[in-house]
Amino acid sequence: MVNYRIVVLLFLLLASSCNVGPKPIAYGTDGCHFCRMTIVDRQHAAEIVTDKGKVFKFDSSECMMNHLKDIDQKQVALYLVNDYNQPGELIDATEATYLISDRIPSPMGEFLTAFKTEQAAVDALMTYDGDLLTWDQLKLRFNL
């Protein structure tokens, strides 16, 4: 009976430790997995979560995209980016619309900014000029 309880307890512990979900970014403390800079910009940070629950944090979308060149993307469960209009809010990167505008600087100088909705990106385009991209177009731009 004691062995059964231990097995159940271990199973529950293991099952709960493999939670696949985003983790909050500790701005000013967490470092970018790709470039090692401290993550401070709440409008441009990004994160990926593997299918095993491992989280990689980035100071910019461009660092995340460059990191994707070095890993098996089939193991990524979640791609997340910060919404420019809601600093600190992680959104689904595959559903976001991206603006490349030299009038909105990003941490790594690629001027890449994510928006939760296409309309928000179009509104920003009218103000800042530049080019709009979908997730698939962004992957092509980064040769992914």
Residue ranges and their predicted role:
Residues 116-144:
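C-terminal partner/receptor-binding element of secreted or periplasmic proteins
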Residues 19-21:
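Bacterial signal peptide processing site
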Residues 57-91, 98:
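Mature extracytoplasmic domains of secretory-pathway proteins
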Residues 14-17:
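C-terminal motif of bacterial Sec signal peptides marking the signal peptidase cleavage site
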Residues 33-73:
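Post-signal-peptide N-terminal segment of Sec-exported extracytoplasmic proteins
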Residues 3-9:
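Sec-dependent signal peptide recognition
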Residues 42-51, 91-107:
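Short aromatic-glycine-(Arg/Gly/Cys) micro-motifs in beta-strand/loop hairpins
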